[in-house]
Amino acid sequence: MAEEKIINLSHELKNFVYPNDPESSVETKKNGKYFVSELKMGAHTGTHVDYPMHVGLTNEKFENVFGNGYCVSFENLEDFFKNCPEDLEILLIKTDFSKYWGNDAYFEKEIDIENHVKKIISLNLKAVGVDCYSIGNFSVHEKILSSKIKIIENMKNLEILENRSFKFFGFPLNIEKIDGSPINAVAFL
């Protein structure tokens, strides 16, 4: 039996956020003999999942994101749609922008996915994820989220998964009435 490999798809949480988003911080205080850390961050800090409320839609209840995944390069999306896996539930799109993570140039990189949104929606996915700060403009977010497909942004290590099937597991924080959440995402190969 082949040994499974776990690939971490989430960036370390740190104060690297989209301009004008809430900054994040960790402050550790001593409380008697114990130390207690206080976390401050926006819902879209680091690798995160967007919920429908992000674009003003009614939120569904919290749930983990898991299922059969496949990763394709943004440049190969058109060919992918012609022959995608039948059991696909999670589509990850590799842009290679994650190599700029932690650098201001990261927020200057954008993808133009507008022409692919209808095809993404037609796949009836649980989620679509990207290794860049945003999958697209407000219209792209609204179309995808209103189709009950969650969006995962700021992922890493997608080059390891390119053109491969895997099991995907994403664990957001269980917070009531929120527009998104940092997510711990992994792939099992």
Regions found by a protein language model. Give the residues of each.
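Active-/binding-site microenvironments in catalytic and ligand-binding cores
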Residues: M1-L189
